[in-house]
C-alpha cells in the first residue's frame, strides 16, 4: 500500500539527505490523509483499536434479564417453570446446577415483568431455603474479554513492582559443570611446578 501511495504522491523532491528525511515524513502524512479517501483501511493498531471502541459504543445494550439464585438442588425444572409461567413465556431461559444450589436465568420481551418477579420471589422460601432474585445487565462477549484483559494487564504491572516478583532479575548462577571447568583451568602454583620437576629429575 505504501508503494501505491508513493506512486500517487510522486517522488519529485530534493536529493539532499536532510530534505529527504522531511520528504518521507510528508509523504507519510499524505498517505495517512489519502488512505481513507482512496478506500484503504488504516493499518496501524491505534486506528484499529479506535474502530473497535467506536463499534462497541454504537452497539445497543443487551436486554436485561432476571437471575434467580440459591435454589435448592431438589427443586425441579417443572417447579421453576410453574413459578415463572404466571408472568408469561420467557424468550430465553437457562438453568445452571452448582455443587450447592441451582441458578436460573430468564429474559422476557416485556422488561416490566422483571420488576414483578423480583417483588414476588426475592427472599421467597423454597424447600426451606430463601432464594435471591435480581435484575442484571448482560455484557457482550468482547466487552467481557476487554475487561478481563485490562484486569490481567493491571495485575501484571503490579506484579513487576512487587518485591519477590518473578519479573525480578535473578542473579547469575554458575552450574556445577562450569565450576569444574573453572577449577581445572586455574594456573598451577610455583611450588607445585618445582615439586613436579624434582620428582622428574630424581626419577
Curated annotation (Swiss-Prot):
It comes from the Eukaryota. Residues 11-20 have a biased composition (Polar residues). CDD domains: RRM_YRA2 (cd12295). One of its GO terms (biological process) is mRNA transport. Its main location: nucleus. Gene3D superfamilies: 3.30.70.330. Residues 64-138 form the RRM domain. Involved in export of poly(A) mRNAs from the nucleus. Recruited to the coding sequences as well as poly-A sites of active genes. This is RNA annealing protein YRA2. It comes from Saccharomyces cerevisiae (strain YJM789) (Baker's yeast). The lineage of its organism: Eukaryota, Fungi, Dikarya, Ascomycota, Saccharomycotina. The gene is YRA2.
